[in-house]
Curated annotation (Swiss-Prot):
Cited InterPro entries: SecB, SecB-like_sf
Locations listed in the record: Cytoplasm
UniProt function note: One of the proteins required for the normal export of preproteins out of the cell cytoplasm. It is a molecular chaperone that binds to a subset of precursor proteins, maintaining them in a translocation-competent state. It also specifically binds to its receptor SecA.
Residue ranges, annotated region (Disordered): 1-21, 160-188
Name this protein carries in UniProt: Protein-export protein SecB
Gene3D superfamilies according to UniProt: SecB-like
Top-level taxon of the source organism: Bacteria
Pfam family, one: SecB
Polar residues composition bias: residue spans: 176-188
GO biological process: protein folding; protein tetramerization; protein transport
Magnesium keyword on record: no
Source species: Alkalilimnicola ehrlichii (strain ATCC BAA-1101 / DSM 17681 / MLHE-1)
Family: Belongs to the SecB family.
GO molecular function: unfolded protein binding
Gene: secB
Length: 188
């Protein structure tokens, strides 16, 4: 009985001086760019409010130093009353993420889906705040499935690469990790 020791306290590797194999950390979150344009105010406030609203979302990734990446999520919301733009709101929320010890596919998944999902609540709050401060009704952005967008982007890239190979190009598709989504709705 005296020879038995507790197993698996989760600190064995750290106590032996080894670094954990996988590390994920949010190093910094920041508002990178923000704008609200209301080109037709105050006239836009005089009529009935039944705008056509379009939401565009993009995510871009760039490598910084070893194991550090910037992910920038941009949301552009455009509301039109007929042919006139009521407002154009654009917010870019960014973060620096430390990602070490992951295989390429897992790291790319974190950068392409998980990191933008961490930034989205900040974008949602900033967009809503700007639009209401501009005198317009609240604009609550609906949830976004970043995992599905990332998988869709991977499938599109694979199809592009397959088409290029079929045409004899054979070149690999390169570019920054990004996701894009568009939506249109009528705000009431």
């Amino acid at each position: 009985m005296a020879d038995e020791q507790p197993q698996g306290n989760g600190q064995g590797a750290a106590q032996q001086g080894e670094q954990p194999k996988q590390q994920f950390q949010i190093a910094k979150l920041y508002l990178k760019d923000v704008s609200l344009e209301t080109p037709n105010s105050p006239e836009v406030f005089t009529g009935e409010w039944k705008p056509q609203v379009n939401v565009d979302l993009t995510s871009k990734t760039r490598a910084l130093q070893e194991g550090h990446y910037e992910v920038a999520l941009t949301v552009t919301v455009t509301a039109k009353q007929g042919e006139k733009t009521a407002y154009l709101c654009e917010v870019t929320q960014a973060g620096v993420f430390q990602i070490k010890g992951f295989e390429d596919a897992a790291r790319n998944g974190l950068l392409g889906a998980y990191c933008p999902a961490q930034l989205f609540p900040y974008v949602r709050e900033t967009v809503n705040s700007l639009i209401t401060q501009g005198g317009f009704p609240a604009m609550v952005l609906q949830p976004v499935n970043f995992d599905a967008l990332y998988q869709q982007r991977l499938a599109q890239a694979a199809e592009r690469q397959k088409a290029e190979q079929a045409q004899g190009g054979g070149a690999e598709a390169k570019g920054s990790d990004s996701t894009a989504a568009q939506g249109s709705d009528t705000q009431q």
